[in-house]
């Protein structure tokens, strides 16, 4: 089980929820049972489409997806699900909640309540507020990843040495995603990013992951919408060039 799943499962158990840990090879019989409760899907973005297909017999209202990035196309077939945006970071024994994690959908209130009871701050949002939060989180994810890999430095070093580029990556990602979701980007998001990122100054990125769901998705959405995302495009080109 990955870090996100491990932390969520632990919080649920501390709140008194019975948790069945599901892996690629184990736990699926109970997951697909009509008697099962909520199913929280914690796989990486690149694995999501295959898991959604495997869950096709499960009622969408019992599904909770906590992936980052532009995953809406992968979830089109399961309308009525619950989405979560995780705002904590976990690596081994290290855990830090940066902000309350956010949920929207039929299980949002329950998820927020039990996770908060289990020690992970969480809130339920309506659809419009969640869309705005999704755009803001895309800005965060596009900075904390690809640019660090391109420059080979930590997040603190990146924000110090390349502040204008970091701001451009964030603003492009947030603005494009906000337009795609029909919400307005908030100029205050950048200041909030700097506050949330401060405890993560040590973070580095090796080979960037899931770019098609993050910076790559921003560039693709920008093209579709007639917008520009030149800094994200340049960083993607740098990775492609090796």
Locate predicted features.
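Hydrophobic anchor at the start of a short beta-strand
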Residues: 16-20, 61-63, 122-123
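NAD(P)-dependent Rossmann-like dehydrogenase/reductase catalytic/cofactor-binding core
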Residues: 170-242
């Amino acid at each position: 089980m990955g870090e996100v799943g491990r932390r969520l499962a632990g919080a649920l158990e501390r709140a008194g929820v019975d948790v069945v840990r599901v892996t690629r090879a184990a736990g699926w019989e109970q997951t697909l049972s009509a008697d099962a409760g909520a199913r929280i899907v914690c796989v990486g973005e690149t694995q999501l489409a295959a898991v959604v297909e495997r869950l096709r017999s499960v009622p969408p209202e019992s599904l909770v997806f906590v992936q980052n990035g532009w995953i809406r196309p992968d979830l089109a077939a399961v309308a009525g699900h619950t989405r979560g945006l995780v705002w904590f970071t976990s690596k081994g024994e290290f855990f830090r909640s940066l902000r309350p994690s956010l949920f929207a959908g039929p299980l949002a209130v329950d998820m927020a309540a039990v996770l908060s009871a289990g020690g992970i701050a969480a809130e339920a949002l309506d659809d419009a507020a969640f869309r705005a939060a999704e755009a803001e989180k895309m800005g965060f994810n596009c900075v904390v990843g690809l640019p660090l890999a391109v420059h080979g430095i930590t997040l603190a070093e990146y924000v110090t040495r390349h502040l204008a580029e970091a701001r451009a990556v964030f603003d492009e990602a947030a603005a494009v995603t906000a337009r795609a979701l029909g919400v307005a980007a908030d100029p205050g998001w950048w200041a909030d990013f700097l506050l949330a990122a401060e405890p993560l100054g040590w973070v580095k990125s090796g080979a960037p992951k899931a770019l098609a769901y993050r910076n790559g998705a921003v560039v693709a959405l920008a093209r579709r919408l007639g917008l520009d995302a030149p800094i994200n495009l340049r960083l993607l080109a740098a990775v492609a060039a090796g």
